[in-house]
């Protein structure tokens, strides 16, 4: 009889643990999201993302008046000759960059920018030289940019 009485509370406890487990595990292992860019040299594509899956070799966003990290390793030469296409992944809509200084400066072979609507510019304070000398870029829709004077 005592065994039967103990089974009911134990069963309730186990049920409560199973029901709460997804909540506990999602909070225990929450990952930090971050903004980054990935350069695929073979395809000539620079892709911007904002998530918790930054791969090795991905570039962080630049701060202040410094050139972006997708310059080459020593910071003196740009991967500009490799970039023909820029893609803003839908995840980048959650990013809030504060600086776009020289993001595409002198990318003379850049012809296409996809997903520009996912670039939220409301916190950006510096867009200096963002598209300077993009000689092959023939059109650009900036209607989604939110800027203040």
Predicted regions and their residues:
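Negatively charged
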Residues: 31-149
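Bacterial Sec-dependent N-terminal signal peptides
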Residues: 1-32
């Amino acid at each position: 009889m005592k065994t039967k009485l103990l089974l009911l509370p134990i069963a309730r406890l186990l049920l409560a643990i199973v029901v709460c487990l997804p909540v506990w595990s999602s909070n225990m292992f929450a990952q930090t999201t971050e903004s980054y860019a990935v350069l695929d040299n073979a395809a000539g594509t620079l892709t911007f993302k904002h998530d918790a899956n930054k791969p090795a070799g991905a570039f962080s966003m630049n701060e202040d008046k410094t050139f972006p990290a997708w310059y080459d390793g020593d910071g003196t030469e740009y991967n500009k000759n490799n970039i023909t296409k820029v893609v803003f992944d839908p995840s980048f809509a959650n990013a809030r960059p504060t600086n776009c200084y020289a993001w595409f400066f002198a990318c003379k072979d850049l012809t296409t920018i996809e997903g520009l609507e996912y670039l939220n510019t409301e916190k950006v304070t510096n867009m200096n030289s963002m598209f300077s000398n993009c000689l092959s870029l023939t059109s650009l829709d900036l209607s989604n940019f939110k800027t203040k004077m």
